[in-house]
Amino acid sequence: MDVNAKRGVKHVTAEWQMPQILDSLAKALNGTGPALRFAEQSNPSLESVPENIAVVVATSGSAGKAKQIGLSAAALFSSARASNDYLGAAPGDTWSLLLPLTHIAGVNVLVRSLELGREPIDLRNTTLETIPTADFTAIVPTQLHRAVNESGFLLRHLQSAHRVLVGGAMLSGELRKSATDAQLQVTATYGMTETSGGCVYDGIPLEGTEVEIREGRIAIKSTCLASYYLPTRPGETITPITDSDGWYLTNDLGHFDDGRLVVVGRIDDVIISGGEKISLRAVEEFLTPLVDGEVVAFTHPDAEWGERLAIATTASIEVDHWQELQSKIRISLGRHAIPQDIYRIAEIPRGALGKVDREKVLRTIKSKESR
């Protein structure tokens, strides 16, 4: 692909209504209009993109580094068709939109809807008193947690759907059971902007997607892979997403269990403290069921340990209870996995799709300590 052949870019703003968004997206996908950029902030320096790029999605990424990802119409259509086929969606079926369009998961709902010939039911900021029904929808675990614990409008809407896709962050077994108990038909998805969103459903790669494990890391080859990382500022260059063989090596760790992909964390979730490897996610998953609140594990620099393990929690943990928890961690995860500091915070900071923002957790705690 000639990256020097260009097409213009139009930034989608919050003022755009659904008919305008769908019309512009259709033209971007069929090549009769400019590419569309979905992002929370505009980027005047991005005036054009390679001619095969139909959509640009800006994301901070899990590590907090700003990225602009260019996706082709072929990749987006491949993703939409594979998803609709997996779900058994047919022309005339409807999707509801409960996710922001500044994220690939929201954009995917639009492309799937275009494929089915129906405008999605836009429920992002709904004030409707009646409960609209949709055949399919997509949400993040935070929304699912609120639905099954608070009931109300969202739960009833999800119960009306044939299938609810849940992605953007890890879906715990406990939350999945709660969803099943609430009569929700849930499918856990795995993917990222680089893969046009979810490309693995309930551990099984969608049509056109291959998954390998390379030294513990998840590698993906797919017809739905994005094309390029685009410049975020002047002077940066366009970088291909894949290697020369068409594989995208993620920063996620995983393995296969009975033919299904199991995601166990991220490379940056594993830290070294005192020479010992510690999985932050393992610490979180172990402690969360044992306390009355949420738990996030994180680290901060330490002269002695290199990285000092700590947790922040919304729970109130008494001294005796903490000593009991330390003993349980020692037995199950090892002495090195015992957090050396514990902080109580009112709320766990999360991104727009519900992912825990560890850097913001640390900033919040530092801010409290400096007062």
Residue ranges of each PLM-predicted region?
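AMP-binding/adenylate-forming
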Residues: L29, P34, A73-S79, T94-R146
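Active-site glycine-centered loops adjacent to acidic/histidine catalytic or metal-binding residues
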Residues: S62, G168, G191, D252, ...
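Conserved ATP/PPi-binding loop(s) of AMP-dependent carboxylate-activating enzymes
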Residues: P205, R214-G246, R266, E276-I278
